[in-house]
Design a protein with these regions (language model features):
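Conserved Nudix-box catalytic region and its N-terminal flanking loop in Nudix hydrolases
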Residues: 32-74
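Nudix hydrolase/Nudix homology domain
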Residues: 124-164
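A short coil-to-beta-strand element that immediately follows conserved catalytic motifs
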Residues: 79-88
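A structural signal for short, well-ordered beta-strand segments
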Residues: 15, 85, 116-118
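Active-site-adjacent beta-strand/loop module that shapes the phosphate/pyrophosphate-binding cleft
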Residues: 90-124
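Conserved hydrophobic "DFG−1" position in protein kinase catalytic cores
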Residues: 17-18, 39, 118-120, 136
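A generic structural micro-feature
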Residues: 5-9, 50, 101, 105-112, ...
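Conserved N-terminal beta-strand and adjoining loop/helix that marks the start
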Residues: 1-37
């Protein structure tokens, strides 16, 4: 099924990867007591160049937890353990890629996104597949990022629920 101008919504997953430094330098954490969330800078459309959650589209035959673990690994290099579902969100993007035609009401992208709280369980932090960059952020850094749509809410929800 095509992602751009789809015939029906696509099911996607997002990984809210939250951690503290537990002596795992390969995870890129340097301040032991401050919880952080791992975000990627998107390397492809939609939302090219924006900071977002690692994630992607569910593949046929894959469980939601398998999909979120696969996408997290592909985009961050980390093996993660999905612990709980944080929410279900819908993302509908209309119009052309420039956003300059207000009369273009076509659905360009339509995703139903299921986001999971995840914790790193191994791997080496590196941007991969369609991520241009990957980085840990603290809660005070989040407002400046202007995260896409509902991403900020689910990130804060994940930080609030983390008992590490």
């Amino acid at each position: 099924m095509k992602r751009e101008y789809p015939e029906s919504p696509l099911v996607g997953v997002g990984a809210v990867i939250v951690a503290r430094n537990h002596g795992l330098p390969q995870h890129g954490l340097d301040q032991p007591d401050e919880p952080r969330v791992l975000l990627i800078r998107r390397g492809t459309a939609p939302l090219l160049g924006e900071w977002s959650l690692p994630g992607g589209v569910l593949e046929c035959g894959e469980t939601l937890r398998e999909a979120v673990a696969r996408e997290a690994f592909e985009e961050t290099g980390l093996v993660v353990e999905p612990t709980e579902m944080l929410g279900v969100y819908e993302r509908v993007i209309r119009g052309n890629d420039k956003g300059n035609d207000k009369n273009d009401k076509r659905v360009r992208y339509h995703y139903v996104l299921i986001d999971f709280l995840c914790h790193p369980a191994g791997g080496d932090l590196k941007a991969g597949s369609d991520a241009a960059d990957v980085r840990w952020f603290t809660r005070p850094e989040l407002p400046a990022l202007k995260l896409a749509y509902d991403a900020n809410d689910v990130v804060l929800k994940g930080l609030n629920r983390t008992q590490i």
